[in-house]
């Protein structure tokens, strides 16, 4: 048995020495040390030996295994080092070649439009206010004169965290918080993301951007609202743009209106974008409802104000002639590189 083990060990070592690849080395390992390997088989047959022979043979087998394993590790390391060196040699970089130019990013059309809108209002004396996107029901609905049974509160329109907390459906809660924390005069805008329970299609998204504005002071009138928004439209879309106001209803303003502007595509002549009317709806607006003022601790007999709100995504689509809102969120560089 001793001679047989010595022969097996020498055979294994000689075969290991002759291999060229790691796959050949693995075959040898399996042949001698695998579950059915020759050295493993001898170990399993130890039960057939006499009590005197077992410790002697066991020691010899373990010594042979240790020698083979050590050789396997040594040769495997040499093979891997050689393969690594060959790979590195094949990947040699010519350092004299010109480098790649850095790709310079561009501003997203949403960001460009939002910045333009903010700059216009800041130039008119407005401040920019911010607030939480996860909002209390009180700020999103109650304080804005939206009663419990109002359709906007349904789960079809609003994303609820629990009974008292929602993902804000508008940036109007920022106006409420501002009126609670600042004394008039107030002149502010509140841009940011809002959330609705909408399915994604060409004109709807569950997440989009809104900008709302608020002016509160003594003696503020609807004429101030019209003058402010008409000036904004001309600065945003050019001096030739015309505007008109239509009566509408919002629970947080009274009276309420929607402002239209002459179509940016056809100049008011009528086209596919404006559906032949020559006009495009831009925003909703109105005088702040007395109940909203009271909810914020302001006396409607002393103070008045106006509010307005834009869908920023819609403004982007109108400004650049984009007919699918999904393009703004798909990160398609072919689309974004146009701006």
From Swiss-Prot:
CC cofactor: Mg(2+)
Annotated residues for binding of Mg(2+): 254
Molecular functions (GO terms): ATP binding; catalytic activity, acting on a protein; magnesium ion binding; phenylalanine-tRNA ligase activity; transferase activity; tRNA binding
GO cellular component, one term: cytoplasm
Compartments reported by the entry: Cytoplasm
Catalysed reactions listed for this entry: tRNA(Phe) + L-phenylalanine + ATP = L-phenylalanyl-tRNA(Phe) + AMP + diphosphate + H(+)
SUPFAM superfamilies referenced in this protein's UniProt entry, alphabetically: Class II aaRS and biotin synthetases, tRNA-binding arm
Presence of keyword Transmembrane: no
EC number(s) recorded for this UniProt protein: 6.1.1.20
BP terms from Gene Ontology: phenylalanyl-tRNA aminoacylation
Keyword annotations of the record: Aminoacyl-tRNA synthetase, ATP-binding, Cytoplasm, Ligase, Magnesium, Metal-binding, Nucleotide-binding, Protein biosynthesis
Cofactor note: Binds 2 magnesium ions per tetramer.
CDD domains: PheRS_alpha_core
Matches recorded under PANTHER family: PHENYLALANINE--TRNA LIGASE, MITOCHONDRIAL (PTHR11538:SF41), PHENYLALANYL-TRNA SYNTHETASE (PTHR11538)
Record's subunit section: Tetramer of two alpha and two beta subunits.
Protein family membership: Belongs to the class-II aminoacyl-tRNA synthetase family. Phe-tRNA synthetase alpha subunit type 1 subfamily.
UniProt xrefs under NCBIfam families: pheS
Name the record gives this protein: Phenylalanine--tRNA ligase alpha subunit
Encoding gene (name): pheS
């Amino acid at each position: 048995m001793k001679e047989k083990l010595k022969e097996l060990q020498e055979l294994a070592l000689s075969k290991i020495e002759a291999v060229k690849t790691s796959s050949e080395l693995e075959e040898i390992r399996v042949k001698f040390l695998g579950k059915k390997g020759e050295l493993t088989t001898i170990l399993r047959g130890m039960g057939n030996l006499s009590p005197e022979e077992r410790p002697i043979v066991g020691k010899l087998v373990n010594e042979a295994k240790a020698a083979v394993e050590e050789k396997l590790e040594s040769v495997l390391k040499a093979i891997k080092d050689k393969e690594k060196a060959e790979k590195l040699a094949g990947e040699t970089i010519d350092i004299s070649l010109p480098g790649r130019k850095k790709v310079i990013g561009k501003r997203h059309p949403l960001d460009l439009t939002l910045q333009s809108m903010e700059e216009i209002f800041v130039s008119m004396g407005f401040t920019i206010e911010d607030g939480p996107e996860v909002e209390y029901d009180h700020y999103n609905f109650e304080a804005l004169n939206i009663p419990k049974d109002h359709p906007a509160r349904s789960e079809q329109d609003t994303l609820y965290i629990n009974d008292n907390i929602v993902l804000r459906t508008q940036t109007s809660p920022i106006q409420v918080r501002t009126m609670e924390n600042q004394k008039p005069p107030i002149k502010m805008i509140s841009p940011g993301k809002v959330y609705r329970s909408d399915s994604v299609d060409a004109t709807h998204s569950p997440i989009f951007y809104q900008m709302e504005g608020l002016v509160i002071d003594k003696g503020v009138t609807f004429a101030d609202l019209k003058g402010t928004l008409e000036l904004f439209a001309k600065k945003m879309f050019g001096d030739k743009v015309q505007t008109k106001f239509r009566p509408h209803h919002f629970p947080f303003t009274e009276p309420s209106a929607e402002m239209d502007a002459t179509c940016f595509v056809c100049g008011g002549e009528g086209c596919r974008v404006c559906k032949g009317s020559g006009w495009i709806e831009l925003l909703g607006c109105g005088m702040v409802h007395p109940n909203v003022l009271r909810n914020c601790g302001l006396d409607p007999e002393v103070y008045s104000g106006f509010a307005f709100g834009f869908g920023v995504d819609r403004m982007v689509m109108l400004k650049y002639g984009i007919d699918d809102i999904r393009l703004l969120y798909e990160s398609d560089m072919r689309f974004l590189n146009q701006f």
